[in-house]
């Protein structure tokens, strides 16, 4: 029995957002295939996620060194710790997010900022940083209206690349990715594209 954390980074309704359809399909199929697992859903748009700033930066540094924190620093660190600990305690983590303006929604970026903690998700060594979450399974679920997997747009795609890079930096070696793309670029094939993506999500979820 495993604990799986589902992180949702889109508050648009499913009928308006393919990434939400993808997230919901993966979630439903995962629950069906793994009835004994503990599923925790985290909707980032329903959380209070202050941007990382001086109090959180100084506070996490001082906490790591065992120094006393100011009241403001302690509050900021407590927010980050809440999400970091939840992430660390999960055996598997699923991220559902769209490509917006070539990158990820700001709430997801802020959430990942909270996870980026020396001594927790990575450590410094003389040879460079080393990730610490290697045994955690990660799934990335992304939808984008255009085609970014190939062609001239491929090099400017900074959503899946960013999240995958951060998880890799944290040491993740077991990552699954499901992407639905091109449904806006090719509207005559949109239904077919989306259906194929949801079918792929179901397959990946059943084995994840």
Curated annotation (Swiss-Prot):
Which UniProt keywords are present, listed alphabetically?
Answer: Flavoprotein, FMN, NAD, Oxidoreductase
Oxidoreductase listed as a keyword? yes
The coenzyme or cofactor needed here is: FMN
Q: Does the keyword Nucleotide-binding apply?
A: no
Q: Which Pfam families match?
A: Flavodoxin_2
Describe cofactor binding as the record notes it.
Binds 1 FMN per subunit.
One example GO MF annotation: oxidoreductase activity, acting on NAD(P)H as acceptor
Q: Known EC number(s)?
A: 1.6.5.-, 1.7.1.17
* Reaction(s) the record says it catalyses: 2 a quinone + NADH + H(+) = 2 a 1,4-benzosemiquinone + NAD(+); N,N-dimethyl-1,4-phenylenediamine + anthranilate + 2 NAD(+) = 2-(4-dimethylaminophenyl)diazenylbenzoate + 2 NADH + 2 H(+)
Partners and quaternary state? Homodimer.
What this chain does, per the entry, is described as: Quinone reductase that provides resistance to thiol-specific stress caused by electrophilic quinones. Also exhibits azoreductase activity. Catalyzes the reductive cleavage of the azo bond in aromatic azo compounds to the corresponding amines.
User: Which family is it part of?
Assistant: Belongs to the azoreductase type 1 family.
Q: What is this protein called?
A: FMN-dependent NADH:quinone oxidoreductase 4
């Amino acid at each position: 029995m495993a604990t799986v954390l589902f992180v949702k980074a889109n508050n648009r309704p499913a009928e308006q957002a393919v990434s939400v359809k993808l997230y919901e399909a993966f979630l439903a199929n995962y629950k069906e295939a793994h009835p004994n697992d503990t599923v925790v859903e985290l909707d980032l748009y329903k959380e209070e996620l202050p941007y990382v700033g001086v109090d959180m930066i100084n506070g996490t540094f001082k906490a790591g060194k065992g120094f006393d924190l100011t009241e403001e620093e302690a509050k900021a660190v407590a927010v980050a710790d809440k999400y970091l600990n939840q992430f660390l305690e999960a055996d598997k983590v699923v991220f559902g997010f769209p490509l917006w303006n070539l990158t990820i929604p700001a709430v997801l970026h802020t959430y990942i900022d909270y996870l980026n903690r020396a001594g927790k998700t990575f450590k410094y060594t003389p040879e460079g940083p080393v990730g610490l979450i290697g045994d955690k399974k990660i799934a990335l679920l992304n939808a984008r209206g255009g085609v970014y997997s190939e062609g001239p747009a491929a090099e400017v795609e900074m959503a899946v690349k960013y999240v995958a890079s951060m998880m890799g930096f944290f040491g993740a070696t077991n990552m699954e990715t499901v992407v639905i793309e091109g449904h806006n670029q090719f509207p005559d094939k949109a239904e077919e594209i989306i259906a194929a993506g949801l079918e792929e999500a179901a397959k990946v979820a059943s084995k994840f």
